[in-house]
A protein has these predicted regions:
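Feature targets compositionally biased, intrinsically disordered low-complexity regions
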Residues: 5, 40-42, 169
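Start-transfer (signal-anchor) and selected internal transmembrane alpha helices
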Residues: 1-13
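Metalloprotease/metallohydrolase-associated module, dominated by Zn2+-dependent proteases
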Residues: 56-165
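Short, charged juxtamembrane terminal tails flanking transmembrane helices
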Residues: 2-3, 161-170
Length: 170
C-alpha cells in the first residue's frame, strides 16, 4: 500500500470533516430537542432565516424552538447538553479509529461541538446572570467561522503529518 501524500490527506480530511460536521450539527440539534423534552419542555426543530452581521443577507439554519420558556436552569441544560451529547458518539469512534485522517476529522468535530456547548451555555449565562450581551456569539459568521477555522486547522494537521521528513539517526 502506498503512502498517502500531504495533498491527498488534506482533501480526504476536508471531505470527511465536512461530512461529519453535517451529521454532528444535525445530531446536536436533535439532542437539544431530546434534552428539552427530558427537562419537561416541548418544542420542535425548525429551519429559520439567520441574519448575517457583516453582510446584508440571510442564511438558513436548523434551530430548536421551545413552545414556551423552560426557565434558566433547564435552558442551560438544553443549551449545553445538546452539543455535548452529540460529541459522545464521535468520541467513541475516536477511541477506536486508527487512520490519521479519520482521527483528525473526528477531533475537529469533537472540538467544534465543545465550542458550541461553551458558547451556547456561556451566552445564556452572560445574558441572564450578568446582563452582558455579546452579540457576536449569536452571529452566523462567528458560529460558522470558528468551526471553519477548526476544520482548516484539521486539514493543515493532516497535510503536515503526511509531509514531515523523518531522518533516521543512529
Amino acid at each position: 500500500m502506498r503512502k498517502t501524500t500531504g495533498m491527498e490527506a488534506a482533501w480526504r480530511t476536508l471531505l470527511l470533516t465536512v461530512l461529519l460536521f453535517v451529521a454532528a450539527f444535525g445530531t446536536h440539534e436533535v439532542m437539544h430537542l431530546l434534552v428539552l423534552y427530558a427537562v419537561g419542555g416541548h418544542g420542535s426543530i425548525v429551519v429559520r432565516p439567520w441574519r448575517m452581521g457583516l453582510f446584508d443577507a440571510d442564511i438558513y439554519a436548523l434551530h430548536v424552538q421551545p413552545d414556551q420558556p423552560v426557565g434558566l436552569d433547564r435552558q442551560l441544560l438544553v443549551n449545553f447538553l445538546g452539543p455535548a451529547l452529540a460529541a459522545v458518539p464521535l468520541g467513541a469512534l475516536l477511541f477506536y479509529a486508527r487512520e490519521p485522517v479519520v482521527r483528525v476529522a473526528l477531533w475537529a468535530n469533537v472540538a467544534i461541538l465543545a465550542f458550541y456547548a461553551i458558547i451556547e451555555a456561556g451566552d445564556l449565562i452572560l445574558e441572564s446572570a450578568y446582563e452582558i450581551d455579546l452579540s457576536i456569539l449569536t452571529t452566523p459568521e462567528f458560529n460558522y467561522g470558528v468551526p471553519a477555522l477548526m476544520m482548516l486547522t484539521a486539514i493543515f494537521v493532516a497535510w503536515r503529518q503526511n509531509t514531515e521528513v523523518h531522518v533516521a539517526t543512529g
